[in-house]
Amino acid sequence: MIVSGAELVVAGLGVDIEGRHIVQDVDFVAHPGQVVGILGPNGSGKSTMLRSIFHSRRPTKGTVTVDGVDVWARDTKWSSRHISVVLQETPAEFPLTCGEIVRMGRTPHKKSWRSLSEGDLALCGAAMELMEVGDLATSTFSRISGGERQRVTIARALAQQTGLLIMDEPTNHLDIHHQLKVMELSRRLRSTVVVALHDINLAARFCDTLVLMSKGTCVAAGAPSAVLSPGILDDVYKVCTHLGRHPSGAVQVTVL
């Protein structure tokens, strides 16, 4: 499942909702093929910022470009061909099978009157096997567990074959094995990945760049070793932290 990664540039992004500044002056770049982690406490603006990137919440100011194209100057059809999304929570009321959910990922790429091609179906099957949900193809989406639904949703995003993959807390509901699998997959993909996480150590281990949010602003951005300093983390999360090393060599954060 190979697709070239896109370059994402977020410049001066601001989002106001009902007169409140939810996101303010956020700048960062996700280079092709990078994994960029978005960190921050609850209410720091992570999800709102991501929605502005994938054409769901129009920004009040600033720009979002994918390979030089202003996302908000194009329609949702264009966005769905270039950006795939895994939301924090996926509605479970769909009266569809898991296979049908995954095949929805190919919809942006086909003519409305045509059926999916053999190649499309093969992509969907490969995505389901990759996420270890191939045996759920005929199961009703609403009747499987939350973790299984999350993996099916990620398979749908993979089948979409876009240069930019946005994931909002994709490891929610997943056991340790599948948390690691999702993050390892993010590293292997050639797509550019922007992922919001609460697990700082997962982010430190698997992300090339981190963007740390607090109260709607970006307080630090850069390599994990630069962003994850006790002074910054203690101030943002209001806890005491200690830095060590994971056996992989990544920074490891312990809350004291």
Which residues fall in each region the model found?
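ABC ATPase nucleotide-binding domains
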Residues: 234-256
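Conserved structural motif at the start of ABC-family nucleotide-binding domains
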Residues: 8-10, 23-25
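Helix-to-loop junction immediately C-terminal to a conserved catalytic motif
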Residues: 54
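Catalytic Walker B motif of ABC-type/P-loop ATPase nucleotide-binding domains
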Residues: 165-169, 174
